[in-house]
Amino acid sequence: PFTDFGFKKLFGSEPNKDLLADFLNELLPDKHKIHTLSYSKSEYLGPSLSDRKAIFDIFCTNEQGDKFIVEIQRAKQIYFKDRSIYYSTFPIQEQAIKGIWDFRLTAVYTIAILDFVFENDNNDQHVVVKVQLKDQDNQVFYEKLTYIYLQMPFFNKTAEELETNFEKWLFVLKNIEKLTEIPSRLKNKIFMKFFGEAEIANLAQEERAAYEQSLKVYRDLKNVTDTAFIEGYGVAKQEAHNKLVNAIKKAISLGNSIQETAEIFEISESEVEKYLNQ
């Protein structure tokens, strides 16, 4: 599922709304649980044509009007947290009503499945990182804006160790490509459907080709970014710059557009063009 095609096939298609709802409900408080959901457009433009746009992997709404951005992030980005905050402003802004409006908002959730981990000074290895706006006394100031990040490299349970439905979801998301058979603890209605949808042999030929291409881009791009992003500990500035330039050129060579490459590296399109000419 750590490919665009695989992720959207399993969670972003109309017949699989029950899979997405079951997964999201493991992360949500009771008052925001999803009973029914609808998919919304995944591309949003800024207020003017010159503004950046946001392209979500999956964007959906529940019956109460709560908004959910669901994304899969394969490679570490320098300004990933900034990007995450920026993207969450779009479903907030779209709630504005012309004319008289009391500014009441519905909840907005950003849920990101990460194929990497955040830098952490205290060595905590939390699979789930939940972020909300808090005051100086560490009390939640605003409860309708929530960011939930799943650091998949920290989840290492085996099939025999799975206890909760949430752990089962984490397990299949991380291990589905490695499994040769369905573990007994995952043989329920939801997960049997998930495995059925994920079975490559059941995909149409065109879908399978799209999957293989998506998988190739993921593996190549992950290899590039794993070596390109510099953590900043004693690495010469020029060396870091050279690796960034090479990574950008590699991303373009893999078929990404200038706009897509700018999204990947969290830089402007003009900066991408500048690096390509170096």
Regions found by a protein language model. Name each.
Residues 1-278:
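Elongated, amphipathic alpha-helical interaction scaffolds
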